[in-house]
Amino acid sequence: MKKNILPLIALIFLPLLFNNCDDAVSDNKEYTAIDSRINIKLAEELSPDKRTLYLYCGTERIYGCINYGIDYYVIKGANSFKIKFNSVVISDICLTALGPASCRIKMGELSEGTYNLSLEVNGKAELAVLTVTNDSYKITHTPGFDFKFDNAELKRVPEYLIWGSAGYINDSLTNVVDTFLDSLQILGAAPVNLSAGDYGFFKIDSSGKMVPPEYHGYPFIKMYLFDYQNNPEDVKGLMKRIQQQYVNQIYISCYTWQGD
């Protein structure tokens, strides 16, 4: 009996190691061929104890159901990844909205270094190189017929960074928002200069300023980012006081390098 246990365990867990598909809403699925280019975007997930790189992948073709997925598998080597995209996954339940077939591929918590990527679909492969440093992820890839990277470089959020926005409904509230930003510095927040680029959660333009979201929904908005190493509860308390005093007039968001 002992001779059969390990092979049986291997057979059970092998699909879990290498096969992945979309988060579909039903187990009743059909599959169809991938017939358009796959666009790939780098994204880093932040948490208090680690940082995880993901690839967000979507077909160039737009479908009538937003919940179509992409079936794929990944084989990871010491410094390499082979990613094979198999097919578009069609659920029997359609969430009616236009969108690409998509999937999210977990690359993991990667050490600094260089990684070779092999991207395969419909029997053809394209090669790319991923360079990981403490400051960024960079992709070296010549766009081909089957794959395209939307962001060839993803800057990494520095330690102790906080950032966000203050949206407000009337220009007369500008002084209140400025007071909030000044109060952050009284609490210990220090101005920080970041190089231009895409940080995933925000972008910095060539002048070093934080770019407001394209569709932020406020008549007026101010962006901010600081180095902050003191008690985060003090910032939460400051935000709460202002938003309680100016209900439905000022909306403040705040995010941290630990994913809060």
What are the roles of these predicted feature ranges?
Residues 1-6, 11-39, 260:
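Bacterial Sec-dependent N-terminal signal peptides
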Residues 63-65, 89-99:
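Short, cysteine-centered beta-strand-loop-beta hairpins and adjacent loop/turn segments enriched
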